[in-house]
Amino acid sequence: MKKFYNIKSQNNITGIYIYGEIIGGSDKWDESDVTFDDFKKALDTMNNGDTLEMYINSPGGSVFTTQGIVNMINRCKKTKNIKVVSYIDGLGASCASWLPMVADEVYVYNTSMLMVHKPMSSLFGANANDMQSEIELLNKLEIIGRR
């Protein structure tokens, strides 16, 4: 199975190719999915002053997994003084648009798209209390996404 991400290291540069959906740990069905732990393993190998290059072509995915990745990258920037460079190779949509927001440099090609939207969800068989809880969660996620 082909992974949607690929990690390459060369001369103090670690490249992470995010080409597919960002999946929560409980949703991982096969090796093509990636979780927070997959990114943690890559960033744990980086040394002080290294550069992380993120190549993004993703429709998004799990907002909570993405937020965990964003927080981990921010922590690594502070503790290891890494530089983060982001390239939107094709599509950086939905929560995948959060990843370049933590970069020191962002490159978007003329043929690429960065799509930011309000958080979305779906409910089935929900009552008014369930819907109100979901509204509150979506409002919180929107505030988090603005940070």
Where is each model-derived feature located?
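Terminal-region recognition feature
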Residues: 1-147
